[in-house]
Amino acid sequence: MAAKIRKGDKVIVLSGRDKGRTGEVFEVRPAEGRALVRGVNIVKRHQKQTQNQEGGILSKESPIDLSNIAIVGKDGKPTRVGFKIQADGTKVRVAKRSGAEIDG
């Protein structure tokens, strides 16, 4: 299946604890069907002290399921993603809400 959500996309959370929050995707894990979104789904991790790193409680992003996020369109609303083949044969992502091409 083609990647509808890619690194660098601006997305909005559709359900869960962070519903309505937006952020940028900085990692996609297609095998797991999950993505890491900056500033969303923050969890606390207790880090044990090592020689290189000090211990303590760290805040970091946790993966969120791809079904719970949607790309934000140019109008600021969530949109589904489709694909269109252009005249020169290249495949581009298209916002279903507006029909506009998605950069990337």
Swiss-Prot record:
<dbReference type="InterPro" id="IPR014722">
    <property type="entry name" value="Rib_uL2_dom2"/>
</dbReference>
<comment type="subunit">
    <text>Part of the 50S ribosomal subunit.</text>
</comment>
<dbReference type="InterPro" id="IPR008991">
    <property type="entry name" value="Translation_prot_SH3-like_sf"/>
</dbReference>
<dbReference type="GO" id="GO:0005840">
    <property type="term" value="C:ribosome"/>
</dbReference>
<dbReference type="GO" id="GO:0019843">
    <property type="term" value="F:rRNA binding"/>
</dbReference>
<keyword id="KW-0694">RNA-binding</keyword>
<protein>
    <recommendedName>
        <fullName>Large ribosomal subunit protein uL24</fullName>
    </recommendedName>
</protein>
<comment type="function">
    <text>One of two assembly initiator proteins, it binds directly to the 5'-end of the 23S rRNA, where it nucleates assembly of the 50S subunit.</text>
</comment>
<dbReference type="InterPro" id="IPR003256">
    <property type="entry name" value="Ribosomal_uL24"/>
</dbReference>
<dbReference type="Pfam" id="PF00467">
    <property type="entry name" value="KOW"/>
</dbReference>
<keyword id="KW-0699">rRNA-binding</keyword>
<keyword id="KW-0689">Ribosomal protein</keyword>
<comment type="similarity">
    <text>Belongs to the universal ribosomal protein uL24 family.</text>
</comment>
<dbReference type="InterPro" id="IPR041988">
    <property type="entry name" value="Ribosomal_uL24_KOW"/>
</dbReference>
<dbReference type="InterPro" id="IPR005825">
    <property type="entry name" value="Ribosomal_uL24_CS"/>
</dbReference>
<dbReference type="GO" id="GO:0006412">
    <property type="term" value="P:translation"/>
</dbReference>
<dbReference type="Pfam" id="PF17136">
    <property type="entry name" value="ribosomal_L24"/>
</dbReference>
<dbReference type="InterPro" id="IPR005824">
    <property type="entry name" value="KOW"/>
</dbReference>
<keyword id="KW-0687">Ribonucleoprotein</keyword>
<dbReference type="GO" id="GO:0003735">
    <property type="term" value="F:structural constituent of ribosome"/>
</dbReference>
<dbReference type="GO" id="GO:1990904">
    <property type="term" value="C:ribonucleoprotein complex"/>
</dbReference>
<comment type="function">
    <text>One of the proteins that surrounds the polypeptide exit tunnel on the outside of the subunit.</text>
</comment>
